[in-house]
Amino acid sequence: MNETEFHQLVDSQLERIEAAIDEAGADIDYETSGNVMTLEFDDGSQIIINRQEPMREIWLASKSGGYHFKSIDGEWICSKTGLELLTLLKQECDKHADEPIDWV
């Protein structure tokens, strides 16, 4: 994948994340600045999602640790867990919120 394709795929994934948060009605503030999306929770904890251009990966950092995702067959798959990005992100958001979020 070239650089343009990578950015289009990441932008699309970040939009999916925003839509999932909005649809869930979750009390999560999010902001995207440059290559970084920050999710902030009531207790001040954060999840950071950023694109790593040289590696063509998306990285996620949370209080559980760091995760690297590669695009495989149209999905962003974690090299550590094998989970898809949105699946793992939802689990991490539940942990940060200290309660289950009603994901749609």
Swiss-Prot record:
The keyword Iron applies. InterPro entries: CyaY, Frataxin/CyaY, Frataxin/CyaY_sf, Frataxin_CS. CDD domains: Frataxin. One of its GO terms (molecular function) is ferric iron binding. GO terms for biological process: iron-sulfur cluster assembly. Keywords: Iron, Metal-binding. Signal peptide: none annotated. One of its GO terms (cellular component) is cytosol. Belongs to the frataxin family. Involved in iron-sulfur (Fe-S) cluster assembly. May act as a regulator of Fe-S biogenesis. NCBIfam families: FeS_CyaY. PANTHER family: FRATAXIN, FRATAXIN, MITOCHONDRIAL. This is Iron-sulfur cluster assembly protein CyaY. It comes from Vibrio cholerae serotype O1 (strain ATCC 39315 / El Tor Inaba N16961). The gene is cyaY.
